[in-house]
Design a protein with these regions (language model features):
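Beta-propeller domains
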Residues: 69-93
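Blade-edge beta-strand/turn elements of extracellular beta-propeller
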Residues: 37-54, 86-94, 125-137, 175-194, ...
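Short loop/turn segments immediately following beta-strands, especially the blade-tip
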Residues: 220-227, 310-317
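Short, solvent-exposed loop/turn segments at conserved positions within beta-propeller repeat blades
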Residues: 75-76, 114-115, 161-173, 212-215, ...
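Short, conserved, GDST-rich strand-edge loop motifs in beta-rich repeat architectures
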Residues: 25-26, 156-171, 310
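Beta-rich, blade/repeat-based domains predominating
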Residues: 53-69, 94-118, 136-154, 170-175, ...
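A short loop-to-beta-strand structural motif that recurs across blades of beta-propeller domains
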Residues: 79-81, 118-120, 174-177, 216-218, ...
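Blade/loop signatures of beta-propeller domains
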Residues: 22-50, 170, 317-320
Length: 321
């Protein structure tokens, strides 16, 4: 009982702190800024940005469900919602500081529960089980983003960005991990300052992880032994204070990267060329491919979820075999 009470108080304090800080909402107009003509192979020049839902505190972790809704984490109200096509919101669970989400291959929702310092799996009724909360006996920092890999395992980042106030960091690094279906946990890299978003290439040969602190994106070779090798800088996203940092990552079927960053979403080709930027009204944290053809980007951006139609098809790792 005392433990549950303490956790409840902690959840309230986290939410209160975020509410006091308030979401930073830049006053920007939506626009598509092209750096290359290849950018227009991905978007119509007259594309319109739609508001899918609004009225949140701070949105994260979108996941499209084929039944016609999007899972959305709200880090201020500490809830995960189903948001339907008509904008209706339905609470799945109240959970301290939910962050990035993904589906596994069985279409079960996997969440980075920052306050629990754990990776959890939720059923359709919102009941959850902890899949992992420590490595070599030491608690995770604050798991941030998660993706299903080409081998069906769960991959996630563990920065200190949302380490609960008053709690100590037990691991002496910020890592990226692999959690296989048997529950075996493997540390893939610990050389990054604040690893955040991550994604795999459609051919399964490369993994991308951005570092919010260093404002860059790294690419790793994904080996046959399910490990990361030969990490190097893929691209950089410089910006001023308050402009946003590299965060969520998604990939299309051609291998182009869509990375939230300063002022919007930066679009990169396979060679690391910055093709252009989707400038958004609010600072985005993450994004997901959705609709039946997976040609629409659903973008969690501060108080809202936006949608943008594209001319390409998203790569959905949990549907890949």
């Amino acid at each position: 009982m005392r433990w549950r009470f303490s956790i409840a108080i902690l959840f309230v304090l986290v939410a209160f702190g975020k509410l006091c800080a308030g979401p930073q909402i830049p006053k920007r107009d939506f626009k598509l800024e092209a750096n290359s003509k290849e950018f227009w192979a991905l978007f119509d020049r007259d594309a319109k940005l739609g508001t899918f839902a609004t009225g949140f505190g701070f949105t994260e972790g979108p996941v499209w469900d084929p039944e016609g809704f999007v899972f959305v984490s709200d880090e201020v109200t500490n809830k995960i919602f189903r948001v339907y096509m008509d904008g209706r919101k339905e609470e799945l669970i109240s959970l301290g500081d939910p962050d990035g989400n993904t589906y596994d291959r069985q279409r079960r929702l996997i969440d980075c529960a920052s306050v629990l310092r754990a990776i959890i799996r939720l059923d359709r009724q919102g009941k959850y089980e902890i899949l992992a909360d420590r490595f070599e006996g030491k608690r995770f920092n604050s798991p941030n983003d998660v993706v299903t890999g080409p081998d069906g395992a769960i991959y996630f980042t563990d920065p200190t960005l949302d380490l609960p106030e008053g709690q100590k960091q037990e691991l002496p690094y910020q890592g990226v991990y692999r959690l296989d279906p048997s529950g075996k946990l493997t540390l893939l890299t610990k050389e990054m300052s604040q690893p955040n978003g991550l994604a795999f290439s459609p051919d399964g040969k490369h993994a991308y992880v951005d570092d919010s602190d260093r404002r860059n994106i790294l690419v790793f070779d994904f080996t046959s032994g399910h490990s990361f090798a030969n990490g190097r800088v893929f691209g950089e996203e410089p910006g001023g204070k308050g402009d946003g940092v590299p965060d969520g990552i998604k990939v299309d079927q051609a291998g182009n990267l869509y990375v939230t960053g300063p002022k919007g979403i930066w679009v990169w080709d396979l060679a690391g060329h910055h093709l252009g930027t989707i400038v958004l009204p609010e600072q985005p944290a993450n994004l997901a491919w959705g609709d039946a053809d997976y040609q629409t980007l659903y973008i969690t951006a501060t108080t809202s979820v936006y949608k943008l139609r594209t001319k390409t098809h998203g790569f959905i790792p949990y549907l890949s075999r």
